[in-house]
Amino acid sequence: MARQSKRLAPRRLKRKVSKGVVHIQASFNNTIVTITDSSGGVLAWSSAGACGFRGAKKGTPFAAQTAAETAIRQCIDQGMRQADIIVQGPGNGRETAIRALQLAGVGVSLIRDITSVPHNGCRPPKQRRI
């Protein structure tokens, strides 16, 4: 019979971080919120799909708000007080996720939009016919 190994240390280390960076990736289909420390190590993440939304509901502003609240709650428990926000993508949940972070009690010192805009690069896909 195989021997079971016991885990000695907890899986996720709780770190005390006072300032972090919140990355919001908002597409039309989903919103992903990742919170990192200043060096880029991931502290917490959440997405609309991970919060239980499925299908077209993942792209809604309410789903983005729920994902942001879930992620920031984990970081407030680790002692986060200040955050920079980096937003990427054209999705519906951009503004709602930012508002949810501000209402959660974390001081926002910077909001940066890094959405890439093509200077007429690749040809877009064909138009949908419904």
Curated annotation (Swiss-Prot):
One of its GO terms (biological process) is translation. Belongs to the universal ribosomal protein uS11 family. Part of the 30S ribosomal subunit. The keyword ATP-binding does not apply. One of its GO terms (cellular component) is ribonucleoprotein complex. The keyword rRNA-binding applies. It comes from the Eukaryota. It is found in: Plastid, Chloroplast. Keywords: Chloroplast, Plastid, Ribonucleoprotein, Ribosomal protein, RNA-binding, rRNA-binding. This is Small ribosomal subunit protein uS11c. Pfam families: Ribosomal_S11 (PF00411). InterPro entries: Ribosomal_uS11, Ribosomal_uS11_bac-type, Ribosomal_uS11_CS, Ribosomal_uS11_sf. One of its GO terms (molecular function) is rRNA binding.
